[in-house]
A protein has these predicted regions:
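Active-site segment flanking the S-adenosylmethionine/decSAM binding pocket
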Residues: 188
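A short beta-turn/loop motif at secondary-structure boundaries
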Residues: 102-106, 199-202
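Catalytic core of non-heme Fe(II) oxygenases with the double-stranded beta-helix
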Residues: 108-185, 195, 207
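Short hydrophobic/aromatic beta-strand or adjacent loop that forms the aromatic wall/cage
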Residues: 9-13, 131-133, 205
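OB-fold ssDNA-binding interfaces and closely related basic DNA-contact patches used
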Residues: 86, 104-111
Length: 213
């Protein structure tokens, strides 16, 4: 008797290791945004973050919104990183990516932003109105192995989906040293959330995200 497993076609979630060059590029964009007048917050946004090298060391009280809009100069990050990932996604997906796309459009980055959070801050479950989304962690101060002895999901990034019989499932991405300088790439309509951490409340997690249409 021979038993074989049949894998059900689905859309993949990709994990990407970012090069040092591209991590530095993202920090450069954050530093430039830190020197710019915010369209709604005004001058109080300028120099609201403090750095040591490429690490965020302080977030001033004037940082009243944890979402910092970024500018991808000459589409450098999109062309060097996102476009090749889209190509690989189309190759690796079990299902036709065309079903995710509305009309015959060339991909472009609709939104591009950074979140600078203390790990005790959280983001409730939500989805984005794009085709693909990504989350790139370039500064991760947490250590899951220690804090998850009390809370097994503490500081996790969680993706929600339904299995083949329609029951809810989730994929937990652990925030530890190995998560730094990695990027997740997934369909925008996937629900996802960020759990709060119980420790490291005076340190900062830096995540750069974007939506592709």
């Amino acid at each position: 008797m021979k038993i074989r497993k049949l894998d059900v076609p689905n859309y993949p979630i990709l994990s990407v290791d970012l090069s040092d060059e591209h991590v530095k590029l993202l920090f450069k964009y954050i530093k430039k945004a830190n020197e710019s007048v915010h369209p709604t917050m005004g001058n109080q946004w300028i120099h609201t973050l403090e750095f040591s090298g490429d690490a965020v060391t302080n977030r001033k009280p004037t940082f009243t919104n944890d979402l910092m809009e970024l500018v991808d100069e000459n589409d450098e990050f999109f062309n060097d990183v996102i476009r090749p990932v889209i190509t690989q996604y189309c190759v690796m997906s079990d299902l036709a990516v065309e079903h995710l796309v509305q009309g015959d459009k060339k991909p472009l980055m609709q939104r591009f932003w950074a979140r600078i959070n203390t790990p005790d801050e959280y983001a409730p479950a939500h989805y984005h109105n794009g085709v693909f989304s990504f989350a790139a962690w370039i500064q991760v101060p947490t250590n899951n192995e220690v804090e998850q002895q009390q809370d097994p999901e503490s500081s996790d990034f969680v993706l929600h989906y339904s299995n083949i019989i329609g029951l809810p499932e989730k994929l937990n991405v652990k925030m530890h040293d190995g998560a730094e300088n990695t990027m997740l790439f997934f369909p925008s309509r996937m629900m996802h959330e960020v759990h709060a951490s119980r420790t490291n409340h005076n340190l900062y997690r830096v995540c750069v995200s974007g939506d592709i249409i």
